[in-house]
Each structure stands twice: as structure tokens, then as C-alpha cells.
């Protein structure tokens, strides 16, 4: 950190990249995010008189996407060491194939390949949608019939709490759903790097995810079969 502080003092709060007007512009205090809080590095003359902005993104500036250096860095830091190693190997392999086929004209994906891409992306999201909707319905119903009667919360509030439980469960079950989908024997579609970047492939990918989530959410409504109207009538009688 002691080596980075002189460099951070020479950068503005908006960017760490040198610009053409960086030398002529005055140097406002920089902000250093140290994990536990924000540390203001004020210039020798004292603190500025203007308002201070907390955070690394100024107002109305969008968050960094994955196609930027900051977004890619944030994504890499969120991975485990084994995941980073596997990602690095696959990136090297993918780039070597892309360089070898750079001058070759890649044909568009065939309808069979597009169908395979569609199915490959739809199956995991069927599991995601199924678990999300089923857990939300079961948790929301039990919350409404237990805590809802005691505290007198509405049905929408119970559904919101059920959605909270479903989201928390999804954080831990996402890896198991992906592992189960990989055991079905669906390997990665055999496409060249140029074919992966074509609009037909991306369209099939997004359609597969959308259809998979839709089917999964519809299948996840099956707990409604076991919840009849008697429980609702009992709740209304208890409230009255």
C-alpha cells in the first residue's frame, strides 16, 4: 500500500488513467478504497471546500461492465483459485484457436448446432426456475400461515419474505443445479470462436435461457396443488 499511495495521489477520483489534461488540471483529493472504509488522501494544503462523493463511481456513471478492465478485475477477484486456474487455461486455449482461425471464413452455425446451443442453455435454467418458484411458494405459504397470523402481515408481504428465502436458497443451490445439468451428458457445443460470437449463437443462447426459466417457473408451481382453500379460510377466521 505504501508503494501505491504516491501513485494514487497523482490520480483524480474519477479515473486512475492518465489523460491529456491531467497534468494541467488541479489535483483534488483522491479516494482510496481500503476494504474497511474510504480514506481521503487530502493535499498538503488541507481539505477541499466542495462536497465530497463517497465511492469510486461519480454520479450518473454506470457500473463497470465485464468488457472493461475494472469489470473484468472485479469478476476475477470474485472467483476461487481453482476457478481462476481453469478460466485461465480455457482462455489460453480459446485464444490460440481464435488466432489459428483468424484468417479463415467461418460459416454460420447450422440449425442442428443452434438447437444444441438452445437446449444446452435451457436445461440449467429449468432447474433454476423450478427451485426458485417452488421454494418461494412453500416458504411464502408457511410464513403467511404462521408468522402472518401472529403479526398480521398481508399476503404480499408473506410472498416477499418467501421470495427472500428462495433467493437465499438459490445462492447455495446454484452450483448443485449446474453440476446436475452437466451430469446429463450435454457437453459444450462444438463451435469455433467466430461462430460463438455470431448473432445466431447469441440469440439461441438467450432464447434457451428465457424458455428454460419459463418452463421451470411453471413446473415450480406444483406446490399449489397441495395448498387448498381451507387454509385461507382458516386464516381469515383467525384474523376475524
Curated annotation (Swiss-Prot):
Key words of the record: Cell membrane, Membrane, Mitochondrion, Mitochondrion inner membrane, Transit peptide, Transmembrane, Transmembrane helix
Coiled coil spans: none
Signal sequence interval, chain numbering: none
Record has Transmembrane as a keyword: yes
GO CC, any one term: nucleolus
Annotated membrane topology: Multi-pass membrane protein
Subcellular localization(s) per the UniProt record: Cell membrane; Mitochondrion inner membrane
Regions that span the bilayer: 111-131, 143-165, 210-230
Tissues expressing this chain: Predominantly expressed the ventricular tissue (at protein level).
Extracellular side: 132-142, 231-240
Pfam families: TMEM65
Superkingdom field: Eukaryota
Boundaries of the annotated transit peptide in chain numbering: 1-61
Disorder: Defects in TMEM65 may cause a mitochondrial disorder characterized by a complex encephalomyopathic phenotype. Clinical features includ microcephaly, dysmorphic features, psychomotor regression, hypotonia, growth retardation, lactic acidosis, intractable seizures, dyskenetics movements, without cardiomyopathy.
Subunit structure: Monomer. Homodimer. Interacts with GJA1. Interacts weakly with DSP. Interacts with SCN1B.
Entry function: Essential for maintaining proper cardiac intercalated disk (ICD) structure and function as well as cardiac conduction velocity in the heart. Its association with SCN1B is required for stabilizing the perinexus in the ICD and for localization of GJA1 and SCN5A to the ICD. May regulate the function of the gap junction protein GJA1 and may contribute to the stability and proper localization of GJA1 to cardiac intercalated disk thereby regulating gap junction communication. May also play a role in the regulation of mitochondrial respiration and mitochondrial DNA copy number maintenance.
Identification of the protein by name: Transmembrane protein 65
Lineage: Eukaryota, Metazoa, Chordata, Craniata, Vertebrata
Gene expressing this chain: TMEM65
Amino acid at each position: 500500500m505504501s508503494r501505491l499511495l504516491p501513485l494514487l495521489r497523482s490520480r483524480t477520483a474519477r479515473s486512475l488513467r492518465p489523460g491529456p489534461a491531467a497534468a494541467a488540471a488541479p489535483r483534488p483529493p483522491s479516494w482510496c478504497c481500503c476494504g474497511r472504509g474510504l480514506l481521503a488522501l487530502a493535499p498538503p494544503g488541507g481539505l477541499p471546500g466542495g462536497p465530497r462523493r463517497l465511492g469510486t463511481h461519480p454520479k450518473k456513471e454506470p457500473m463497470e461492465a465485464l468488457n472493461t478492465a475494472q469489470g473484468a478485475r472485479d469478476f476475477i477477484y470474485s472467483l476461487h483459485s481453482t476457478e481462476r486456474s481453469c478460466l485461465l487455461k480455457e482462455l489460453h486455449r480459446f485464444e490460440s484457436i481464435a488466432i489459428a482461425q483468424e484468417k479463415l471464413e467461418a460459416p454460420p452455425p447450422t440449425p442442428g448446432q443452434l438447437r444444441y446451443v438452445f437446449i444446452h442453455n435451457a436445461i440449467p435454467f429449468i432447474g433454476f426456475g423450478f427451485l426458485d418458484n417452488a421454494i418461494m411458494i412453500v416458504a411464502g405459504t408457511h410464513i403467511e400461515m404462521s408468522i402472518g397470523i401472529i403479526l398480521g402481515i398481508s399476503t404480499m408481504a408473506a410472498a416477499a419474505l418467501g421470495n427472500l428465502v428462495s433467493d437465499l436458497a438459490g445462492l447455495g443451490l446454484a452450483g448443485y443445479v449446474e453440476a446436475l445439468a452437466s451430469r446429463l451428458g450435454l457437453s459444450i457445443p462444438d463451435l469455433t470462436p467466430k461462430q460463438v460470437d455470431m448473432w445466431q449463437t447469441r440469440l439461441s443462447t438467450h432464447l434457451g435461457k428465457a424458455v428454460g426459466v419459463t418452463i421451470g417457473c411453471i413446473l415450480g408451481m406444483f406446490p399449489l396443488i397441495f395448498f387448498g382453500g381451507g387454509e385461507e379460510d382458516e386464516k381469515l377466521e383467525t384474523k376475524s
